[in-house]
Amino acid sequence: MRTNNMFKVAILTISDRGFKGEREDSSGPLITEMVKDLPGEVIHYKIIPDEKEQIIEALKICTDGLKADLILTTGGTGLSPRDVTPDATFEVIEKEVPGFSEAMRAESLKKTPHAMISRAIVGIRGSSLIVNLPGSPKSVKENLEVILPALPHALSKLKGDPSECAQE
């Protein structure tokens, strides 16, 4: 649901070191700034550790409790044993929306071959869209720039917008 014609956005930074206060979160504030153009209003921001059950719980709070339109996670999308954000997200979503993650990887591959190791997924739970973003601010910016133009339409569709998807 939109408040004041703004999409409700929740941001979850997944980082063991950020959670312990050993590293400042730069990606969460960057996301906050970038979603203003949706237009988006950040209604929830939290740093949580790379613990699958805690990520699942946080995602459910954002979708089922807070009824956020968009949940953006940052961090935990790689191959390290502690990178479990996509695994937790997969357990929470009802449908995957692969076009977003494919677009992010395709654009990132133009800059680095390391984009191939991203396991980030995007999906929906109820009427919420959950997007996994990488952890580094540079990658967050690059990935968000790719998907931001499509987010308002996708979020409106999730809310039941009956207009046609085709554009002339």
Where are these regions (language model features)?
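Non-catalytic beta/alpha edge segments that cap or flank active sites
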Residues: 1-168
